[in-house]
A protein has these predicted regions:
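Helix-turn-helix
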Residues: 1-22, 26
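Hydrophobic alpha-helical connector segments
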Residues: 26, 39-71, 123-130
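Short, basic, alpha-helical segments at the C-terminal edge of helix-turn-helix-like DNA-binding modules
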Residues: 30-35
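Amphipathic alpha-helical packing segments from all-alpha helical-bundle domains
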Residues: 36, 51-54, 87-113, 124-128, ...
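Amphipathic alpha-helical segments used for helix-helix packing
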Residues: 52, 67-88
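Amphipathic C-terminal alpha-helical segment
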Residues: 63, 110, 130-147, 160-167
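Hydrophobic alpha-helical segments that form the core
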Residues: 71, 76, 121-140, 153-160
């Protein structure tokens, strides 16, 4: 299929990337750069705070209605499908999860500094919870869960953020 889409033969692809495994790893890296960094990168910008986190969940809640997300997330699928013994998944997935968790933590740290949330909030624990929430949304997308349920989960994450706000 790839050969047909690109109009090249398999040996040309392997000459460029070395092997099917190396092609897949290059695809994962490109996905991280173009999708993960684009979606989660703004969370690490100074002053991001709770609004930036809410925007991520709003995006996925709204996007669940569209056809582009029917198969979920490439890196999440790489985690689920091949299993923990797959060398690509075992290398790429921890970096992916760390990138997302660090982005959420950065925005939460900004929120704490700006007084949006209490300074005593465990921002690492909250970041890990938000990472698990967004990955859960990706799994739901992959499983073909109705869009209304996915939007509901995204809304619950946003309401959780509101519960962290300082009085």
């Amino acid at each position: 299929m790839l050969e047909e889409r690109l109009g090249v033969n398999r040996s040309s692809i392997y000459a460029e990337f070395g092997s099917k495994q190396e092609l897949f790893e290059a695809s994962l890296e490109r996905y991280r750069e173009t999708v993960v960094d684009q979606r989660f990168g703004p969370l690490a910008e100074p002053g991001a705070g709770l609004d930036a986190i809410s925007a991520v969940f709003d995006f996925y809640g709204d996007a669940a209605e569209g056809p582009a997300f029917g198969r979920g997330c490439l890196l999440c699928n790489t985690t689920i499908e091949p299993g923990p013994d797959d060398p690509t998944g075992s290398q790429a997935v921890p970096r992916y999860l760390e990138r997302i968790s660090n982005a959420f933590k950065s925005a939460l740290d900004d929120a704490a500094r700006n007084g949006e949330i209490s300074g005593s909030t465990d921002t690492m624990q909250e970041a890990q919870f938000l990472t698990a929430s967004v990955l859960g949304i990706f799994v739901m997308l992959r499983a073909g869960v109705p869009p209304a349920a996915i939007s509901g989960v995204a809304g619950a994450a946003t309401r959780h953020l509101a519960s962290l706000e300082s009085p």
